[in-house]
Swiss-Prot record:
Protein name: Kunitz-type U19-barytoxin-Tl1a
Miscellaneous field: This protein was not detected in the venom by mass spectrometry.
Keyword vocabulary terms for this entry: Disulfide bond, Protease inhibitor, Repeat, Secreted, Serine protease inhibitor, Signal
Cell location: Secreted
Function: Serine protease inhibitor that inhibits trypsin at a molar ratio of 1:1.
Claim: Ion transport is one of the keywords in the record: no
SUPFAM superfamilies hit by this protein: BPTI-like
One GO CC annotation: extracellular space
Similarity comment: Belongs to the venom Kunitz-type family.
Signal peptide location: 1-18
Transmembrane segments: none
Site (Reactive bond for chymotrypsin): Y38, A39
CDD domains on file: Kunitz-type (cd00109)
Length: 176
């Protein structure tokens, strides 16, 4: 009798563990939520019904945890890791979706905007070739605006944006 109970228990445990791979984290079942602010951040959310990561625009504050900077990050967290290459690849997909060029985004000047929020952000400084902190006001910014230094560095990585020395070489050649 005890052997049968142990056998059935282990069988049920095995079934539960096998099905656990199909379980999506609860955050991934939340709907896309732009939040209550009016900034413009292209993001991805996991759509549990289609089992895909879809794009949406995040307003910069509020919202929920079903929000990712890249399709790859979204798929890794919610879709079982089948989302393709790293965050740089996801950044390129996001930019292409919005008809933006990564070099153009990373070349934009920092833009605080006219609103009075106090949101620490990072932008890529083309002159120094580094991601630097600035205070974003919460509205009317541009795409060179990242929540973390890591996101900025990933998006404006050396292979993605023109470096100051490349720009200088181009201008020097054009001057002659």
């Amino acid at each position: 009798m005890n052997f049968e109970l142990i056998y059935v228990s282990s069988l049920l445990l095995g079934i539960c563990l096998a099905n656990q791979a199909d379980v999506v984290p609860s955050d991934c079942n939340l709907p896309a939520d732009a939040g209550m602010c009016y900034a413009y951040f292209p993001m991805f959310f996991y759509d549990a019904s289609s089992r895909k990561c879809l794009n949406f625009i995040y307003g910069g504050c509020g919202g929920n945890a079903n929000r990712f900077w890249s399709e790859a990050e979204c798929m890794e967290k919610c879709g079982g890791g089948g989302g393709g290459g790293g965050s740089s690849d996801g950044s390129q997909k996001t930019a292409k979706m919005l008809n933006l060029d990564l070099g153009d985004i990373c070349s934009l000047e920092k833009k605080v905007g006219p609103c009075k929020a106090h949101m620490p952000r990072y932008y890529f400084n083309r002159e120094t070739g580094l991601c630097e902190e600035f205070i974003y006001g919460g509205c009317s910014g541009n795409h060179n605006n990242f929540q973390t230094k890591e996101q900025c560095e990933s998006f404006c990585a050396p292979g993605n944006s023109p470096r100051p020395e490349e720009e200088t070489r181009k201008r020097t050649k054009q001057s002659y």
